[in-house]
Amino acid sequence: MNSIVNFSQQLIQNFQEVSQKTVADSSNLKAFAYLGAGLAMIGVIGVGAGQGYAAGKACDAIARNPEAQKQVFRVLVIGTAISETSSIYALLVALILIFVG
């Protein structure tokens, strides 16, 4: 049990030393903020591909059954709005990292 406590104390001490060195260099901090913003925007790729696929399938469904156009369109709009929220959150995270970080 004592070795676990010593390990955790050493881990905390090492983390504090590293974080103090990193915060002292603001150019590294800004570079990491830009890197994080870029990584946050990777999530938008999947949303765009998914929305394109859904729109294509909706066009196929309307072509096969034109009478169901209103129902297919309603489901498409709701599904697109729900899937778009994740890309909006990714954009907000990226903007916060760039301008606040």
From Swiss-Prot:
It is a multi-pass membrane protein. GO terms for cellular component: plasma membrane; proton-transporting ATP synthase complex; proton-transporting two-sector ATPase complex, proton-transporting domain. It comes from the Bacteria. It is found in: Cell membrane. The chain crosses the membrane at residues 31-51, 81-101. The record marks E84 as: Reversibly protonated during proton transport. Gene3D superfamilies: lithium bound rotor ring of v- atpase (1.20.120.610). Keywords: ATP synthesis, Cell membrane, CF(0), Hydrogen ion transport, Ion transport, Lipid-binding, Membrane, Transmembrane, Transmembrane helix, Transport. Belongs to the ATPase C chain family. F-type ATPases have 2 components, F(1) - the catalytic core - and F(0) - the membrane proton channel. F(1) has five subunits: alpha(3), beta(3), gamma(1), delta(1), epsilon(1). F(0) has three main subunits: a(1), b(2) and c(10-14). The alpha and beta chains form an alternating ring which encloses part of the gamma chain. F(1) is attached to F(0) by a central stalk formed by the gamma and epsilon chains, while a peripheral stalk is formed by the delta and b chains. This is ATP synthase subunit c. It comes from Mesomycoplasma hyopneumoniae (strain 7448). The lineage of its organism: Bacteria, Bacillati, Mycoplasmatota, Mycoplasmoidales, Metamycoplasmataceae. The gene is atpE.
